[in-house]
Regions:
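N-terminal charged helix/coil linker that caps or initiates catalytic domains
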Residues: 1-21
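Oxidoreductase and adenylate-handling cofactor-binding alpha/beta cores
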Residues: 154, 220-237
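E1/E1-like adenylate-forming module used to activate ubiquitin-like modifiers
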Residues: 109-216
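Buried hydrophobic packing segments
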Residues: 32, 36, 76, 222-230
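Glycine-rich adenosine-cofactor-binding loop
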Residues: 17-54
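Glycine-rich phosphate-binding loop and adjoining beta1-alpha1-beta2 segment
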Residues: 47-84
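Phosphate-binding loop/pocket of nucleotide- and phosphate-handling active sites
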Residues: 1-3, 231-243
Length: 243
């Protein structure tokens, strides 16, 4: 809009029309999707999630009671269509799998990892590296944001997640069905989490069914991820780093 001119220039707006962002997971991912759509941080979104909205999701997904049991992608796509019916959406209603991962990543300028599954997180990065596509991940703890520059292999230290995980280990994670302490440490490093995060994160996969997420964290993380996506899509030299 005119009010955003110079924050986002005419030239950038024109360039962003030709950019595609792929988002895997539509809990915190839905906030990123809506933020990108609202400021037109891309011209197209690929959305992937097989799950439905449950009552337990309503602490972090902005939706109405009448949307319970609807697929998460429906809730997200509907929210976007209500303010921008012209944004191009491509839906992967069965989520991403080993069978469609290459198709999902193909054509994306940036990927957002917002899923809970260890196997999918790992497989997404293997494919992102193969197709040279950057990945953004918000951990929803003390504002932690990962920007992974697989489009700039000279920056990634030859591995994944800023050199934290080597390729054989990532391939083994891609076959995993549940989170292990080793995987959690590799992806997050619990010692770097907030005090309360250090208490809750180690319980993922045992006492907690998924990542602990508060709506304040989801809002902040979704916005930060959306801005990172826009800046990456515009070719800014954002570092391969955990912020």
């Amino acid at each position: 809009t005119n009010g955003n001119r110079e924050k986002i220039t005419r030239e950038e707006t024109a360039a962003l029309r030709n950019k595609t962002v792929g988002i895997v997971g539509l809990s915190v991912g839905s906030t990123t999707a809506v933020a990108l759509a609202m400021e037109r941080g891309c011209g197209a979104l690929k959305l992937a999630d097989f799950d439905v909205v449950e009552l337990s999701n309503m602490n972090r997904i902005r939706c109405a009671l009448h949307e319970l049991e609807l697929p998460k992608w429906v809730v997200t796509a509907r929210a976007i269509a209500e303010f921008d019916p012209f944004l191009e959406l491509e839906i992967f209603e069965d989520g991403v799998t080993t069978e469609n991962m290459d198709v999902f990543v193909s054509g994306c300028d940036v990927l957002v990892d917002a899923c809970d599954s260890l196997g999918v997180k790992a497989a997404l990065r293997l494919e992102a590296k193969r197709q040279a596509c950057p990945v953004v991940m918000d951990t929803n703890d003390r504002g932690m944001l990962d920007i992974e520059r697989y489009d700039r292999p000279e920056w990634t230290l030859g591995g994944f997640l800023h050199g934290r995980i080597d390729e054989p280990t990532m391939k083994s994670f891609a076959q995993a069905k549940i989170w292990t302490r080793e995987a959690l440490q590799a992806f997050v490093n619990v010692a770097e989490a907030s005090e309360r995060g250090q208490r809750s994160l180690p319980k993922v996969g045992t006492e907690l069914v998924s990542w602990p997420q508060t709506y304040t964290g989801v809002c902040a993380g979704g916005a930060h991820a959306a801005e990172a996506c826009r800046r990456l899509a515009l070719g800014e030299a954002l570092p391969d780093a955990r912020i």
